[in-house]
Amino acid sequence: MKYTELKDKSIKELEELLHAKKAELFELRVKLKAMQLSNPNEIKKARRNIARINTAINAHYSSSVE
């Protein structure tokens, strides 16, 4: 997922996507603790996707203020 894909979405869509990605991150952490996660790098990717979504949300809010 790239920032360019996210910046065209509405705030509501971004917040729904953020909620889904946070749930995915939680599931990955549970799998990691249960030793069922085959690729621990997926946690890093999920965290970065969450950061990208938060950046897009903040950009929408800052552009609407101006």
UniProtKB/Swiss-Prot annotation:
GO terms for biological process, alphabetical: translation
Gene3D superfamilies: 1.10.287.310
GO MF term set: structural constituent of ribosome
Matching InterPro entries: Ribosomal_protein_uL29, Ribosomal_uL29, Ribosomal_uL29_CS, Ribosomal_uL29_sf
Record's GO cellular component terms: cytosolic large ribosomal subunit
Entry keywords, A to Z: Ribonucleoprotein, Ribosomal protein
Superkingdom per UniProt: Bacteria
Family: Belongs to the universal ribosomal protein uL29 family.
Family matches, as PANTHER family: 60S RIBOSOMAL PROTEIN L35/50S RIBOSOMAL PROTEIN L29, LARGE RIBOSOMAL SUBUNIT PROTEIN UL29C
Protein name in the entry: Large ribosomal subunit protein uL29
Species this chain originates from: Helicobacter pylori (strain ATCC 700392 / 26695)
